[in-house]
Amino acid sequence: MIVRNDTLWMAQEAFTSGQAYDRAHWAAYTRHDYAVFNPVHTWIEYINRLLGALLGFPVLLATGWTLVRSKSHPKWALTMVAALLVLGFEAWLGKVVVDGNLIPHQITYHMAGAFALLGLLTAVYRSVSSEWELHALRAEREVEGLEADRRAAYPLFMGLIALLSVQIILGTQVREEVDALVKAFGLYADRSDWVAQLPVGLLVHRSFSLLILALSYYLYRKTAGLGGLKVRAAFVLYALLAETALGAAMYYFAIPRILQPVHLLLSAVSWFLLVDGAFKAWLMLRKG
C-alpha cells in the first residue's frame, strides 16, 4: 500500500516495482480515507483500545470469583458470565466499526452493547454491596406512606431506564448523521447549517428529553424519605438536566465538537445511576 496525492493505493497483485509509478498496478483503497496521518485520531484510538483491554482483566477476574461462589450466589455468576460475553462482543464489534470507518447502524449496536455491559456490571455491584446494606435496610424505620413509596419507586426507575434506552438509541442515530456530515465536509468545517441538514429524528430526540426530565423530577419527589433512593433520584435528575442543557447547546450553537463526548458521558452516568437505583429499589422491596 502506498500514499500518492493524499490518497491510499493498494496493489492489485504481487509485482516488482520500478522507479516510475504505474497506475495499472494500483487501485484506490476505499475502506477509509486516512491517507494523511492524524496523531489526535491515532492517540484516541490507541487509548480506547488500551482501556478496553484493561477493562477485560477485572471483568475476567470478577467472573472467576463469582464462579467460585456460584453455589451461594448463582445470579452473580450468571450476570458476570453474561457481562464477559458482552465485553467480548463489544471488542469484536468495536474493531468492525473502526475497520469499516464508522459504518452506520453498527455504531448504534456498539453503543447499545456498551450500555448493556454497564447495566450488567452495575447490577452485580449493587447486588454485592447490598450484602453490606442488609442490616441498614432492615433497621429502617417504617413511616406513614413509606412502603407505598417504595413500591412506586421501582417501576419509576424501570420506566426511566426504558425511556433513556430509547433516547440513547435516538441520540446515537443522530450522531451517525453528524458523522456523515463530518465525512462529507471535514472535521473542522463550518457547522452553522448542519442542524438544518439533520433528519426529523433530531427533533424527536430533543422533545423526548422533556418527557424524561418530567418523569425524573416526579421520581425525585416520590422518593422523599427513602434515604439512598432519594440521593440517587437527585443525582439522576441533575445528570439529566446537565445532559439536556448540553444537548440544547449543541442544537443552538452548531454542534460544538467538545460538547459531543461530554453529552455522551453524561448519558452513561445517568444510565448507571438509574440501573443502580432500580436495583436498590428492588432490594428494598425484597428485604425491607
Regions found by a protein language model. Name each.
Residues 130-154, 285-288:
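Membrane-interfacial, low-structure loops and terminal tails that flank and connect transmembrane helices
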Residues 55-60, 114-132, 209-218, 267-282:
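Hydrophobic cores of alpha-helical transmembrane segments in multi-pass inner/ER membrane proteins
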Residues 191-206, 254-276:
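Membrane-interface transmembrane-helix boundary segments in multi-pass integral membrane proteins
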Residues 2-57, 199-205:
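Individual transmembrane alpha-helix segments
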Residues 85-87, 152-175:
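Alpha-helical transmembrane segments of multi-pass integral membrane proteins
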Residues 167-212, 217-221:
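Membrane-interfacial catalytic/cofactor-binding modules of polytopic membrane enzymes
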Residues 37, 88-111, 174-183, 244-268:
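Interfacial helix-loop-helix junctions of multi-pass membrane proteins
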Residues 73-83, 153-157, 226-239:
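Membrane-interfacial loop-to-transmembrane alpha-helix junctions, especially the N-terminal start
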